[in-house]
């Protein structure tokens, strides 16, 4: 067919239906954090920075939206990406931003397999960003 994964998703309603259904169902699953207390015991953690971050990854989206968007990219492209950076304004001290896989322009590697940096472009602003792997 000669179409990219993104073009297939845009033009095939059945593919969109399956991807949307699966991504939404996965996003409904709770993500829980645990603290290991001993070799065979763990206690659910609801107050750590990680637990807080996963519930509220950034000021623009919920944890459900983060997982749904990430799963959609994973199901379409086979991978997804988050930009995790310190943020003193957030409750956890961190933010997670989902970067749409379609924005990636270049993945530089050491040996063809191991990435050392990613370059992506926001199509709305044409801003190019390169981040280390």
Predicted regions and their residues:
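Structured, contiguous alpha/beta core segments that scaffold functional sites
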Residues: 1-133
């Amino acid at each position: 067919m000669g179409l990219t994964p993104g073009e297939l998703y845009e033009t095939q309603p059945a593919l969109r239906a399956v991807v949307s259904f699966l991504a939404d169902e996965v996003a409904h699953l709770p993500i829980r954090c645990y603290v290991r207390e001993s070799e065979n015991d763990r206690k659910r953690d609801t107050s750590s920075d990680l637990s807080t971050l996963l519930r509220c990854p950034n000021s623009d989206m919920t944890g459900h939206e983060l997982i749904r968007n990430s799963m959609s990219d994973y199901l379409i492209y086979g991978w997804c990406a988050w930009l995790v950076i310190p943020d003193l304004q957030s409750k956890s001290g961190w933010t997670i931003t989902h970067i749409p896989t379609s924005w990636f322009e270049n993945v530089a590697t050491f040996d063809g397999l191991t990435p050392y940096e990613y370059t992506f472009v926001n199509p709305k602003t044409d801003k190019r960003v390169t981040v280390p792997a």
